[in-house]
Structure formats: C-alpha cells, structure tokens
A protein has these predicted regions:
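Aromatic- and charge-enriched surface segment that lines or borders ligand/interaction sites
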Residues: 1-36, 50-55, 198-200
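Surface-exposed binding/hinge segments that line
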Residues: 4-6, 39-82, 101-106
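Short helices/loops that flank or line small-molecule/ion binding pockets
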Residues: 16-18, 146-157, 173-174, 202-203, ...
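Alpha-helical secondary-structure segments
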Residues: 20-26, 51-55, 98-99, 131-136, ...
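Gly/Pro-rich hinge or "lid" segments in bacterial periplasmic/extracellular proteins
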Residues: 71-136, 146, 254-256, 260, ...
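Detector for C-terminal structural segments
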Residues: 106, 110, 211-244, 294-303, ...
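Ligand-site clamp/hinge motif
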Residues: 121-170, 312-314, 319
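Ligand/substrate-recognition segments at binding pockets and active sites
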Residues: 268-341
Length: 443
C-alpha cells in the first residue's frame, strides 16, 4: 500500500529555502525517532523521492495517520536543519514550514510572528493560496480574563483565541464583536473500578448509571458545556447518532430501575436514614474529582442524583494529574477523566486503558476491534466499527459519558475575511486589507 504526496515548486521556508521532498522524508524519520506522537504514523515502512513526489510505503492502512499529519504537532523542517542542529538548537532555531515564523519571544509575555512571504497552501477553504496579508501578529500570553474581554471590545486586541466563560454573554452581546464556536471534541467522563468490592457486580454499576439525570446535570452547566450521551462526540470524526440512541435506550436515566437493581443486590434502607445499607453498612463511595469548575459542578449533580436512590457519594477534589494517577494505580472507586481530540482512535486507545484490570473486562477482544477499525479504509464502515466499540464500552458499565465541552473564539467585526471552523480552524489568508496592509474597517 502506498501514499503519494506532491510538493510543488515555489513553497519556501521563512529562510527563503525551497521545500524539497527530501525534507518530508527527513522530518518523518526524525519524528519516528524522537516524537511521542510517532505511533500516529508508525505504519510507514519506507519512503522514496520520485521527482517532486514522495512515495510512502505503508505496512497497512492506518486511519488516524492523515489526521495526525494535518495536526499542529507534526511539522516539516528543512533536512539540512535536522541534520546540522542539535535537539536544543532545533527547539528555538529551526524554521518549520508554515504561514508564519517566530520573530521575537518574551517568555511569559508575548511572541511576535511574521508572515512567511514564501508560503503557499493547498487549503481549499482559502481563495488566497499565497502569503498571509496580515504581516505581523503579536500573541499575548499573560493577562486577566477581564483585561482580555475589555481589550477586544476597546480595540486593544483584535482576536481572543479563547473567550473567557465568565465574559461570554457580555462579548456575545457586544455589537462590535463576532463570536463563534471554536473547539474540538472533548468528552468528560467517569470510570468505575470494577475490582472494588462495591462495584464488582455489574448490576450495581448499572444502578449508578441509571441514577444519573442529564436533565439535572444540564442545570449546573454553562454555555460551554452540555450533557454527553456518547464517548465519540458530534465534532469528532466517525460520530454516529446510533451510539447516542443506544446509550439513551440502554443506560438512560431511570431512578426506579436504579433502586430496583440496588434492592435486588440486597441494598435497601433498613434504618430510614435515606441511604441504602447492607450487612449494617451504608452504600458509601468516594468520587475522585478534578479541581476544575466543570468537574466540581458535575460532582454536585451526581451527588444529588445518587442520594435520591440512597447512595452516599463523597467527593475528594484534587489536581487532575493526581486523579489520573489514582486511576493508573487502581486507587479509586469512581474517577473524573477527560479526553479532547476530534479523531476517534486516540480516544478509543485511552478509554478504559489507564488501568485495564480495573476498567476493561475484555481487553483482548476490545483491542482487536480497535485494530480492525484502524485498518478499515471506508469511512462509513469505520464509523460502524467505532459505534460498535462504543457500545462495547457502554456494556462494560465501567465508563459513563457526562459532558461535551465546547469553546468559543471572538474578534472585532471590523476585521473581514477570517476563515474559521467550529472545531477551532482559524485562517488569515483571506483577510481583507487595504494597500497599506491595514485590516481594520476596510471597505
């Protein structure tokens, strides 16, 4: 199996050197050697140059490879710089191919980007396939949300890459600001430890799941968050409503069913204290919560839902990295996790995988399903397989999708021609400017 890439003449780095097919080969080989993301293109066996083409030989089809190559963390560097520079020198001294290059950097404060005048793109979304008309960009790192929100309204800033949630309503109402959805797929979910004494019985895990009301959860969430009914979300490749329907049909809110499942397992309220008990002990467990606003709101909602069926959920809040480590170590009962990516294989590689023993009762067959889907060329067939993988995860009753995280970007309405996508794509190639390069209020 082969993949052919063409590198037309005229594409240049900011140094003025032309992009050569050999640069792609050198960049991939370097990435396979040092990159933590190398698994995203590990199927490449060999590469050869044929004129302006690179023929890539693959051991097998890898569905996530193309997505990985268009991501910002996979760049192309001049072969000479790869060979001559040390790793430290590359960090600040190399010149990856792109629309802009770094001209100045003040740590913790700002960076100045300058347009690469030798840049060419094949992006079909852009009419202008050449250098950006915006010649200089100042990217500001430090500042308070209030400063950014007022700054974009007053003209101190032209664009906010991320709208602060607490200023969303104010910026949306401002006549001089355009605001758009600009965030990839990110699902927040919990995993249950099926090796824990309380959760070894799948019907107990089902009782937990059926106790959760997403209508109640929605009351706690902001414009940036909506309840999730699947693990692969609407802005992710291979999303399917079938997965949503399956989850809602089989694992939707049903407090009475939750109570019945608990009672069938011997959990009833024998002392009328509002909590179910068994063998003299109340049903009490610990929720390992990330120290983030969304997670804390979810925890409050779940705590209320579970109390309604007689379960006492106690909340432990800590830094997200400690929550993740608790799951890896198996030191958890229910833990709040999150994954953000708009391509499904990174997701299905990680769901119920931080600690397989605690969360995945059938890893061999699960991994086989993922491997088969990754090799599937047809998109629709692959979507069916991703949906089947989600159903398998749901049926484990060790993972519960909870929140679909969203985000927004805004800019001043006087700037015309920005091309953007709901998943965060942001392109300046078609911005309207006058003869002097001004992009504000150009008619």
């Amino acid at each position: 199996m082969t993949w052919t890439l063409t590198f037309p003449e005229g594409m240049k780095y900011s140094t003025g050197e032309q992009v050569e097919p050999e640069d792609f080969i050198a960049s991939v080989e370097y990435g396979l050697e040092v990159s933590p993301y190398a698994d995203g293109y590990r199927a490449i066996e060999s590469m050869e140059v044929d004129g302006r083409n690179v023929i890539v030989h693959l051991s097998e089809y890898q569905a996530d490879m193309l997505y990985n190559f268009q991501s910002v963390f996979v760049g192309m560097i001049d072969k000479d710089e790869i060979e001559k520079m040390s790793a430290d020198e590359k960090l600040w001294g190399c010149h990856p191919y792109g629309a802009y290059y770094l001209d100045e950097y003040q740590p913790g404060a700002y960076a100045i980007l300058k347009a690469n005048e030798g840049y060419k793109t094949n992006n079909p979304m852009l009419k202008n396939q050449g250098p950006s008309p915006i010649k200089t960009i100042k990217v500001v790192f430090s500042g308070e949300s209030f400063t950014f929100a007022q700054g974009v309204k007053n003209g101190d800033y032209d664009v906010l890459s991320t709208v602060p949630s607490e200023y969303y309503d104010e910026l949306k109402a401002a006549e001089n600001i355009d605001i758009f959805e600009a965030y990839g797929a990110e699902v927040n979910y919990v995993e249950l430890n099926m090796t824990d004494t309380l959760f070894q019985d799948i019907n107990i895990r089902k009782a937990i799941i059926h106790a959760i009301s997403r209508n109640n959860l929605a009351k706690y969430l902001s414009e940036f968050e909506t309840p999730a009914h699947s693990l692969v979300l609407r802005k992710c490749l291979n999303y399917s409503e079938e997965a949503v329907d399956y989850y809602d049909t089989n694992y939707g809110y049903d407090a009475e069913l939750s109570k019945k499942l608990l009672a069938d397992a011997g959990w009833t309220d024998t002392n009328n204290d509002g909590f179910v008990d068994k063998d003299g002990k109340n049903f009490v467990f610990e929720f390992d919560c990330r120290d983030l606003e969304t997670a804390k709101k979810v925890a409050q909602s779940l705590q209320i839902d579970l109390k309604a069926v007689g379960i006492d959920m106690q909340i432990k809040t800590q830094n997200w990295s400690y929550v993740n480590q608790d799951v890896v170590d198996g030191n958890f009962q229910m833990a709040y996790l999150g994954l953000g990516w708009s391509e499904p294989f990174l997701l299905v590689d990680n769901f119920c995988s931080r600690n397989v023993e605690c969360t995945n009762p059938d890893p061999e067959n699960y991994n086989a399903m993922v491997a088969k889907a990754r090799k599937t060329v047809d998109y629709d067939e692959r979507t069916e397989q991703i949906t089947a993988i989600q159903k398998k995860l749901f049926d484990y009753c060790t993972i519960i999708p909870l929140v679909d995280i969203n985000g927004y970007r805004c800019w001043r309405t006087e700037i015309q021609g920005i091309v953007h996508t709901p998943t965060g794509g942001f392109y300046l190639g078609d911005v309207v400017t006058d003869a002097d390069g001004n992009f504000r209020n150009v008619k």
